[in-house]
Amino acid sequence: MTIAFQLAVFALIATSSILLISVPVVFASPDGWSSNKNVVFSGTSLWIGLVFLVGILNSLIS
C-alpha cells in the first residue's frame, strides 16, 4: 500500500509540474486556448483525481 501511495504522490507532483509549465504557455500563445482547451481540461481532471486518490490512500496508510 505504501508503494501505491508513493507512486500516486509522484504522479501528482509530476502532473503539477507539467501543468505549471504548460498552462501559461497555452494562454500566452496566440491560438493556444482554442486549440488546446481539451488538453488543459484533461490535465486538470487528472490532477483533481490524483488529489483525491492521494487523500484516500493517505487515510488508509495513517
UniProtKB/Swiss-Prot annotation:
Q: Could you state one GO biological process linked to this protein?
A: photosystem II stabilization
Domain of life of the organism in this record? Eukaryota
Q: Which Pfam families match?
A: Ycf9 (PF01737)
Family stated for the protein in its record: Belongs to the PsbZ family.
Q: Which residues cross the membrane?
A: 8-28, 41-61
HAMAP family according to UniProt = PSII_PsbZ
Q: Which InterPro entries match?
A: PSII_PsbZ, PSII_PsbZ_sf
Q: Where in the cell is it found?
A: Plastid, Chloroplast thylakoid membrane
**Keyword entries, A-Z:** Chloroplast, Membrane, Photosynthesis, Photosystem II, Plastid, Reaction center, Thylakoid, Transmembrane, Transmembrane helix
Q: What protein name is recorded for this chain?
A: Photosystem II reaction center protein Z
Assembly mode: PSII is composed of 1 copy each of membrane proteins PsbA, PsbB, PsbC, PsbD, PsbE, PsbF, PsbH, PsbI, PsbJ, PsbK, PsbL, PsbM, PsbT, PsbY, PsbZ, Psb30/Ycf12, at least 3 peripheral proteins of the oxygen-evolving complex and a large number of cofactors. It forms dimeric complexes.
Q: Which Gene3D superfamilies match?
A: Photosystem II PsbZ, reaction centre
Gene name of the record = psbZ
Q: Quick check: keyword Nucleus in the entry?
A: no
Q: Does the keyword ATP-binding apply?
A: no
Q: What is its main location?
A: plastid
The role this protein plays is: May control the interaction of photosystem II (PSII) cores with the light-harvesting antenna, regulates electron flow through the 2 photosystem reaction centers. PSII is a light-driven water plastoquinone oxidoreductase, using light energy to abstract electrons from H(2)O, generating a proton gradient subsequently used for ATP formation.
SUPFAM superfamilies for the chain = PsbZ-like (SSF161055)
Cystines in this chain:
none
Output a single Gene Ontology CC term carried by this record.
Answer: photosystem II reaction center
Topology relative to the membrane, per the entry? Multi-pass membrane protein
